[in-house]
A protein has these predicted regions:
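Intrinsically disordered, low-complexity Ser/Thr/Pro/Gly-rich regulatory segments
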Residues: 1-198
Length: 198
């Protein structure tokens, strides 16, 4: 599990979900061959899978911290940069999206209406103007996947959930939560943790 994925996993656990990382779903697709029909199976990886009795979350996680950030055209697939578009295939390729949702439901025993597709972003491109974030969120709201639209979560959403989880007094041996507690104890956090004595 990558570092930012660890933060997202804590946020998902805070929703009462059991979280697993790096799950591949096989998808059969017709190749582009013109001389004959050829079907190939490829595994499409979902970064994090969160599950509880009534819901299954398939999460694509892109930190993009230390880089330009997540670009709207790459997520939506409206780019000539094939490599960048492929990083978001699960989101921007309707047939693959549909087949992954179907396979996840079959594998784990969920109806499509119980499955949610999410995008977690550490840094959106152009954060000052917020243009890319707005475009991505607007695009995602129009995509019906499983039980609803693709949901988009930014760094603030993730950190808010993680800080809330870290505020509880019960100790959990989790690197992310302990890091937050250490930084607070050292006076390095600019905002104090919420007071949750429970």
């Amino acid at each position: 599990m990558e570092a930012f994925e660890s933060f997202v996993a804590v946020a998902l656990e805070a929703e009462g979900l059991v979280v697993s990382s790096g799950v591949k779903f096989p998808v059969r697709l017709q190749t582009r061959r013109v001389d004959r029909v050829e079907i190939q199976t490829h595994g499409y990886e979902v970064d994090l899978v969160g599950a509880r009795a009534d819901r299954l979350i398939l999460a694509t996680v892109k930190s993009a911290l230390g880089s330009r950030g997540v670009v709207a055209e790459h997520v939506t697939g409206e780019t000539t940069n094939e490599s960048a578009r492929k990083r978001y295939t699960l989101l921007n390729h309707p047939e693959i999206r549909r087949k992954v949702i179907s396979e996840a439901g079959r594998r784990y025993g969920y109806r499509a209406s119980q499955i949610e597709l999410r995008l977690y972003v550490g840094r959106f491109a152009g954060p000052v103007e917020g243009v890319h974030e707005k475009k991505i969120r607007a695009w995602a709201r129009t995509k019906r996947v499983g039980g609803g639209p693709i949901r988009v979560f930014g760094l603030g959403d993730v950190v808010g959930s993680v800080r809330e989880a870290a505020s509880h007094k019960q100790y959990r041996d989790n690197q992310v939560l302990v890091t937050i507690k250490v930084l607070e104890a050292a006076g390095m956090l600019t905002q104090p943790l919420p007071d949750n004595s429970a």
